[in-house]
Amino acid sequence: MKRFLLWIISVALGVALLLAAVMGVSYAFTTQGGCPDAAAQFGGQELETNGFCWQVPLLGGRLDKVFASPATLTVQKLGTLYTAHPDITLPDWASYTTLTIQTAVGSVVFAGSVSEYQSFLFPANGEYKAEMTLWRVPKGGMATQFEGGSTGALRKNLGLERPAKPTGWYRYSFRFTLQASADIAFSAERVEQGGIVGVRISGMTGDTAPAVETDLGSVQCVRAADGWRAYIPAAYNASSGGHAVNVAVNGETLTHTLVVLPKDFGTVEVDPEPAATDAANAEFRNAVWGLYEAPAREKLWAGGFVNPAENSMTLVDYGQVKVTNGQQGSRSNSTKLYTIPGEPCRAPANGVVVLARNLALTGNTVVIDHGAGMRSYLYGLQAIAVSEGQTVEKGQAVGALGEELTMDYKLGSKSVNPWLLFQTAGGLFWKENG
């Protein structure tokens, strides 16, 4: 029995020595090279690490070996960056990130994750300092579970993933000077009467909307993923030739010239229209005119518009000169359709109903705001099925059609050609998704 016990003890000691040897070899051969690649970029420039701590698995993930370097006061200088929103490129392994950006005097302008940074706008050009930490944490784990330590220390692996992988972080400290200049692009240099020109303004700092001025109409800018968007109307009666467009942004004014081309919309015979009463005109002005210059909401439409009347015949078209008893009169800023009573009147595009009521001048009236100053004015419905403030989707019934529907599509106060909207043509749909 004594010999057997001695044998058991010797075997156990041998196994322990073998495990110790294996662990020693594993420990010795586990080097800093087992840490993930630290490659990260800001504004297209490679960032240098300023401190790290990693736990690299040993023995199949039962233990971790620590590799660490403390952060220092060193700050990498990136120089001058000329884009308003420098891109951040991360390594594939980064699962949790923190980023802090402050001005030269220490005021924090951003604190959050790298994904949240994507929607951040720098308040102004100038000098900035940033600190970024990139973590690799196992799925189901948290950064607070990370023990860390000094190089060479052993830690118990969390056991949250198989095979076990390194867990830890790299820190980056860098400073840069932002010197961005606005970039303005137009969907076209020339536009026919009735058309729309899209404007994209990018590469600017701050959240103050650019100001666009032109004699073609009132233009408002709205936020977009790449900066700001605006839409310029060339109404049926816009004078042909060059029109200056002045864009004020970041303290500078840039001037561009758009050329309006004439278009022959033809003529149409119409019956004399009865004169409206002063009361009806006043009611219409009070209800509708204020919408022309109302603040623009975010862009809500997506893709082309649909004709509110699925089945119709055109009686008076946009831009046509109305002829009564052989005498030429005014040009039509709207389109009048012969429609089938009782059929649905459809929302031309996504939007918000801003007017839904009966008016003496135009009958049952629905106005839908599609954002960016673009609105649909629908007159003469048999019945109204929506209320003011209601959100509607393209094709949704907003009421029932009568015998005639008058539709007017305006950017601000200027009417545009509806058929271009139905054909998804022109600047309203230019680079819709960026």
What are the residue ranges of the model-derived segments?
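Surface-exposed, short loops/turns at beta-strand junctions within beta-sandwich domains
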Residues: 119-129, 234-241
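Low-complexity, Pro/Ser/Thr- and charge-rich linker/hinge segments at domain boundaries
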Residues: 154-163, 177-192, 260-287
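Cationic-aromatic interfacial patches
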Residues: 169-171, 177-257
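Surface-exposed, glycine-biased beta-strand/turn segments
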Residues: 257-362
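Zn2+-dependent peptidoglycan hydrolase active-site motif and core
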Residues: 333, 347-382, 404-408
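Conserved, short, structured surface segments that act as functional micro-motifs
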Residues: 366-369, 390-434
